[in-house]
């Protein structure tokens, strides 16, 4: 197979996934934007977390809110729970990898904050544990998933499920949805 043909196939797959994602996530997206705006207006914060590529998305989206997305404005309170290697490794060593995010939510989360777990499968144990702790503490426990939503269904609300079984396509939609989230939160919570 020629490389260009392969690239064309990847772009076509992306376009197919893009075509069905909007309708699938529209309603929970609106609720998530509102939850984030309400939390920030009340002095709360948004906590992002995930593993691997989803950890990178968590960092990326938190940075967009703290620094800027489209324009210079006041900083918005957001944090990626994927960046503190001392905390992550101490927790994994002393407790378990399953608790690396939930311990941070226990320490940093407050009722009314928004916790956003990102996992393409919807079933990453440490993300699920963190969402359960967040929900029990009175945070909005939201999620980005793919496939059929996995074990996040019934736990995360709002839950934005990308209707694809291909990890790369799910990740591409997650960052698109995340950018749209940052755009709308920035526009409402910190208008120019």
From Swiss-Prot:
Cellular location(s): Cytoplasm
Reactions accelerated catalytically: 2 D-sedoheptulose 7-phosphate = D-glycero-alpha-D-manno-heptose 7-phosphate + D-glycero-beta-D-manno-heptose 7-phosphate
UniProt record, GO biological process: carbohydrate metabolic process; D-glycero-D-manno-heptose 7-phosphate biosynthetic process
CDD domains noted in UniProt: SIS_GmhA (cd05006)
Entry EC no(s): 5.3.1.28
GO molecular function, one term: carbohydrate derivative binding
Residues engaged in binding Zn(2+): 60, 64, 171, 179
Keywords from the UniProt entry: Carbohydrate metabolism, Cytoplasm, Isomerase, Metal-binding, Zinc
Recorded metabolic or biological pathway in which this protein acts: Carbohydrate biosynthesis; D-glycero-D-manno-heptose 7-phosphate biosynthesis; D-glycero-alpha-D-manno-heptose 7-phosphate and D-glycero-beta-D-manno-heptose 7-phosphate from sedoheptulose 7-phosphate: step 1/1
Keyword Thylakoid listed: no
One GO cellular component term: cytoplasm
Cofactor(s) named in the record: Zn(2+)
Domain SIS, residue spans: 36-192
Residue numbers binding substrate: 51-53, 64, 93-94, 119-121, 124, 171
Pfam families linked to this entry: SIS_2 (PF13580)
EC class name: isomerase
Domain of life of the source: Bacteria
Extra information: The reaction produces a racemic mixture of D-glycero-alpha-D-manno-heptose 7-phosphate and D-glycero-beta-D-manno-heptose 7-phosphate.
Homology family: Belongs to the SIS family. GmhA subfamily.
Subunit record text: Homotetramer.
Function: Catalyzes the isomerization of sedoheptulose 7-phosphate in D-glycero-D-manno-heptose 7-phosphate.
PANTHER family xrefs: DNAA INITIATOR-ASSOCIATING PROTEIN DIAA (PTHR30390:SF6), SEDOHEPTULOSE 7-PHOSPHATE ISOMERASE / DNAA INITIATOR-ASSOCIATING FACTOR FOR REPLICATION INITIATION (PTHR30390)
This protein's name: Phosphoheptose isomerase
Species assigned in the record: Paramagnetospirillum magneticum (strain ATCC 700264 / AMB-1) (Magnetospirillum magneticum)
Upper taxonomic lineage: Bacteria, Pseudomonadati, Pseudomonadota, Alphaproteobacteria, Rhodospirillales
Gene it is expressed from: gmhA
């Amino acid at each position: 197979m020629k490389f260009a043909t392969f690239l064309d196939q990847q772009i076509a797959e992306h376009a197919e996934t893009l075509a069905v994602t909007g309708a699938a996530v529209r309603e929970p997206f609106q609720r998530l934007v509102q939850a984030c705006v309400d939390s920030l207006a009340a002095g709360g914060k948004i906590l992002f977390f995930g593993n691997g590529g989803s950890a990178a998305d968590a960092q990326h989206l938190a940075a967009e809110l703290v620094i800027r997305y489209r324009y210079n404005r006041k900083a918005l309170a957001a944090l990626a729970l994927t960046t503190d290697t001392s905390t992550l490794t101490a927790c994994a060593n002393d407790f378990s990898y399953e608790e690396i995010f939930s311990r941070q939510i226990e320490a940093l989360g407050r009722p009314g904050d928004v916790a956003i777990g990102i996992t393409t499968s919807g079933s990453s144990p440490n993300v699920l544990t963190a969402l359960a702790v967040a929900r029990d503490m009175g945070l909005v426990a939201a999620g980005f998933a793919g496939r059929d939503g996995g074990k996040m269904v019934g736990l995360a609300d709002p839950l934005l499920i990308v209707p694809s079984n291909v990890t790369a396509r799910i990740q591409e939609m997650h960052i698109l949805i995340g950018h749209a989230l940052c755009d709308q939160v920035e526009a409402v919570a910190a208008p120019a």
